[in-house]
Regions:
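WD40-repeat beta-propeller superdomains and closely related acidic/aromatic-rich repeat-like regions
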Residues: 1-332
Length: 332
């Protein structure tokens, strides 16, 4: 299921419904399976393209963080119960490989190192922790954030970890000495609403393009009424080396939206998924303009996405209980 990419021809190819609203999703490395999480605290494994479903029980709360191992043999999940679970997902009956107590409270994001040996996790306890993928042993923890940490990524060469928090601070950690090297300013993603006594926004998602030396960070701005879901999606384009803001990407007409995840396409196009009271959108950006170069309206509020580069396929997890698979090329 792959043709030449054309974002203007993006269309939904498959959709499968679960019993409860979905939260997160990831595509297996081979593109033949999609994992999702639901508000009933379970995980789901869906075959692609058939849509056959298996349900995994193990968490005691919602799961926002999902990652496959580099070989696709295991799925790792981080829950709001503070637990990280490794699952064998190629077995006829998928099972728990190990479960650890990882954080005090919500786990917001996890990432697997490029060599597949290390897992990074972050959450509401403001800690960055590294774990052995093979044993679950804690390798180290790093402190330095002042608020909840929402996002984490590894540099493709494995030398650094980046973590983004509620205040719009992106910390860059040097893994050679496991110390904070520098901080990138992404504070346009942070909002303080004194009338509602609320801090809102933050670096909800990040993606690094080494060839372009650019980091994109997604979230929201113009949060005039956070509790009323009035806030608009925003993506920042930052220089990785010095943190200079190169461009702010905003979207007209989406008055209730937040960018939950961002990724790069191989041609350098940045993609974000927005979900909120205005609905769900796939948003496409390049460096030529601040507004999106294309938007694809999804049928329902979206909470997460994952792109499979080899097949030009996008999975999205939706509040209307659906996992949807969209193709970024013309219908055949």
């Amino acid at each position: 299921m792959s043709s030449a990419i054309d974002i203007t021809k993006t269309h939904i190819a498959y959709q499968w419904k679960y019993d409860r609203p979905l939260i997160a999703c990831r595509i297996a490395p081979d593109g033949l399976q999609v994992a999702s999480s639901s508000e009933d605290s379970t995980l789901q494994l869906w075959t692609v393209p058939g849509g056959e479903k298996k349900v995994l029980n193990g968490h005691e709360s919602w799961v926002h963080a999902l990652r496959y191992s580099t070989d696709g043999g295991q799925l790792v999940s981080g829950g709001c119960d503070g637990k990280i679970i490794w699952w064998s997902v190629r077995d006829e009956s998928p099972s728990i490989v190990r479960k650890i107590d990882a954080h005090a409270g919500w786990i917001r994001d996890i990432a697997v190192s490029p060599d597949g040996n290390t897992l990074a996790s972050v959450g509401n306890d403001k800690m960055v922790r590294l774990w052995s993928m093979s044993s679950g042993e804690k390798l180290c923890e790093m402190a330095g954030h002042e608020r909840h940490i929402y996002s984490v990524l590894f540099h493709p060469d494995g030398s650094h970890v980046a973590t983004g928090d509620l205040l719009g601070k992106i910390h860059i950690w040097d893994l050679s000495d496991r110390k904070l090297e520098r901080t990138i300013d992404a504070t346009p993603l942070y909002a303080e609403n004194k009338g509602q006594s609320a801090e809102f926004g933050g670096v909800r998602a990040m993606a690094l393009n080494v060839e372009r030396n650019e980091l994109i960070a997604g979230g929201t701005h113009k949060a005039t009424n956070p509790f009323g879901a009035v806030h608009e999606p925003l993506v920042l384009r930052l220089n990785w080396s010095d943190g200079v803001l190169k461009k702010s990407h905003s979207c007209e007409g989406i008055t209730g939206g937040l960018v939950w995840r961002v990724q790069w396409l191989v041609d350098g196009t940045a993609v974000g998924v927005s979900g909120g009271s205005t609905g769900g959108f796939l948003l496409f950006f390049n460096d030529s303009q601040e507004k999106e170069i294309h938007r694809f309206k999804l049928p329902s509020l979206a909470r997460d996405m994952d792109i499979h580069q080899a097949s030009n396929m996008v999975a999205t997890a939706h509040h209307d209980n659906h996992i949807r698979i969209s193709c970024m090329f013309a219908k055949e």
